[in-house]
Amino acid sequence: MRAQPAASHFVDGRPLEDETGAPIPVIYPATGEEIARLHEATPAVIEAALASGARAQAAWAAMRPVERARILRRASDLIRARNEELSLLETLDTGKPLQETLVADWASGADALEFFAGLAPAVTGETVPLGQDFVYTIREPLGLCVGIGAWNYPSQIACWKAAPALALGNAMVFKPSEVTPLGALKLAEILIEAGLPPGLFNVVQGRGGVGAALVTDSRVAKVSLTGSVPTGRRVYAAAAEGVRHVTMELGGKSPLIVFDDADLESAIGAAMLGNFYSAGQICSNGTRVFVQKGIKEAFLARLAERADAIRMGDPLDPEVQMGPLVSQAQLEKVLAYIEKARAEGGRLVCGGEASVSPGCYVQPTVFADVTDAMTLACEEVFGPVMAVLDFETEEEAIARANATDFGLAAGVFTADLTRAHRVVAQLQAGTCWINAYNLTPVEAPFGGVKLSGVGRENGRAAVEHYTQVKSVYVGMGPVDAPY
């Protein structure tokens, strides 16, 4: 098969196979072709991964941060040197077009490794003077971490979790989504080639049962999940049993607010990026596009024109701009949401159909006249389906934007920067953009509020979530006791 890896798992520095585990077929969503067949981790594989990680972590934590940094920097350089072949694998694994994977997936992963390599030697404690006594603090690694990935950005997510964990002295056992399991294996190989000691980044494959076994193991100190809200609830509850640290990057139903003084072409471009990039399969997408009434019809007319021009087709064609959804199951889910939007009274502006057979393709779709109570405005679709809602006043837009249980992201388009900052200050979202959308540089924290998650990925903020603080009180004089 065209993308068959050496083995299903990567444990203690080498590929590991156990064919007694349940099979995991890997399907290229553009054609339905099976491109690899892996096997789910058995209890023996899970134990080997956890044991080797726990065993290797102490020596890694004792290493000088600058030495850890050199290894991660080498891994970043290797990824960049092999970006083309890695991007091809990402396209086969996910169905995303090469036009995207060449610039957005492994490239971001390399950025994360490089950023945290640079940050690691600068992580220090503080001194608190107390007269002649004083306290100093030490930032220590948590220990053995578990990372659980999603299927939309599998390799980027693996890097976003591995980079801070490893840079700060932890070990990680990573379980990718069973839908897109290939990229994490490549990352494990590259880290070993770069000089990472065996056991510090292990990859095990599997479905929810494997994740549950990892999360509930007593040796695990931290769980970082990217996934849906229902999955997040289960993982959070399981982690709570052991009072483990958690980072949860979950779903969203994010608002993108377009005021009537906005640059129309830029706002439309952002709305398209926030709904159609990666075939709409991005957690931070601005799927509720609030457009001020005075410009709504002009916005819709130009949006339809640009959406109809999107080139769909074979993701391996470098000219193709939009590929298929990740699976047949996801295709059926998205088409059901489209039919529900029709039935509930949404006005179809463009798209609305499956496209480019065979494969899991859906046309870029826009519904107008959507109301806050419609399913399309309330639930995460995870497909190329945009809901356009109109509003009259700033206060109305803010109130309706916040009327959701989600809080991952939000965007504002306006020429009035005073208004932009005023609006953003009131939006209940962890990540916001002004006159931009879905740009997520690794230098900046990323994460949500409300049901969209806890904790932050990336930026200096990630240090807080992969370390713990030890306080040391130093007494400089005699100890007085009252007895």
Curated annotation (Swiss-Prot):
Annotated S-S bridges: none
Cofactors: K(+)
InterPro entries reported for this sequence: Ald_DH/histidinol_DH, Ald_DH_C, Ald_DH_CS_CYS, Ald_DH_CS_GLU, Ald_DH_N, Aldehyde_DH_dom, BADH
UniProt-annotated binding residues for K(+) 1: I27, D93, V179
Pathway(s) this gene product operates in, as recorded in its UniProt entry: Amine and polyamine biosynthesis; betaine biosynthesis via choline pathway; betaine from betaine aldehyde: step 1/1
GO MF annotations in UniProt: betaine-aldehyde dehydrogenase (NAD+) activity; metal ion binding
Catalytic residues (positions): K161, E249, C283, E457
Binding-site residues for NAD(+), renumbered to this chain: G149, A150, W151, K175, P176, S177, E178, S228, V229, P230, T231, G251, C283, E380
Alphabetically ordered keywords of this record: Metal-binding, NAD, NADP, Oxidation, Oxidoreductase, Potassium
HAMAP family (UniProt xref): BADH
Record's protein name: Betaine aldehyde dehydrogenase
